[in-house]
Amino acid sequence: MSLGLVGRKVGMTRIFTAEGDSIPVTVVDVSDNRVTQIKTVETDGYTAVQVAFGSRRASRVTKPLAGHLAKAGVEAGEILKEFRIDAAKAAELSNGAIVGPDLFEVGQKVDVQGVSIGKGYAGTIKRYNFGSGRASHGNSRSHNVPGSIGMAQDPGRVFPGKRMTGHMGDVTVTVQNLEIARIDAERKLLLVKGAIPGAKGGKVFVTPAVKTKGAK
């Protein structure tokens, strides 16, 4: 139950430490995070903060959403995201408030959620790291086949979850315990150590890590 930020994946680069070590980082733009609604137990049954990110033309906003944003006095955003927080933290915020990168600090562990890059239809070797069959010595036209997918009459079906060919990627992925290597407060950028899910320009959600115990 912690407040997070909505960001846009800019791309990857590297930074250098004082010792000269090269650290690969992903640049995340977290500008224009603005509060559009504060939900409370009394009115909504739970406590949360709704945040808008980015911009959207007024002609592309539905009338109910336009009324909702007008009530908060906030411009339409490209995306709305809700974060569950405690009542004490919610009391410190108000509609229209800007939430910036100062929410985090350098060295803090965070979880980053995004939609992975779609790879299209893929075989089991690419999708699940299956091994190929033998190149020769009795193998004819069965070099990259997945093999058996089950038994015969008993049980007479393919078990759910069987790893087979299919669409790869384009799914929601959360990478946990990434470290914030640097914060550019002026340009409102987070530099996260390592890679995060998604393509350049993709939307990501950055929240404080929930499994910090034992994290390296």
UniProtKB/Swiss-Prot annotation:
Alphabetic keyword roster: Methylation, Ribonucleoprotein, Ribosomal protein, RNA-binding, rRNA-binding
UniProt key word RNA-binding: yes
Free-text description of this protein's post-translational modifications in UniProt: Methylated by PrmB.
One GO cellular component, as annotated: cytosolic large ribosomal subunit
Organism domain of life: Bacteria
Signal sequence extent: none
Any one Gene Ontology molecular-function term assigned to this protein's record: rRNA binding
InterPro entries from the UniProt entry: Ribosomal_uL3 (IPR000597), Ribosomal_uL3_bac/org-type (IPR019927), Ribosomal_uL3_CS (IPR019926), Transl_B-barrel_sf (IPR009000)
Residues bearing PTM N5-methylglutamine: 153
Pfam families (alphabetical): Ribosomal_L3
Keyword Transmembrane: no
GO annotation terms (biological process): translation
Quaternary structure and interacting proteins, as annotated: Part of the 50S ribosomal subunit. Forms a cluster with proteins L14 and L19.
NCBIfam families registered for this protein in UniProt: L3_bact
Protein function: One of the primary rRNA binding proteins, it binds directly near the 3'-end of the 23S rRNA, where it nucleates assembly of the 50S subunit.
Record-stated family: Belongs to the universal ribosomal protein uL3 family.
The protein's name in its UniProt record: Large ribosomal subunit protein uL3
Lineage start: Bacteria, Pseudomonadati, Pseudomonadota, Betaproteobacteria, Burkholderiales
Encoding gene per record: rplC
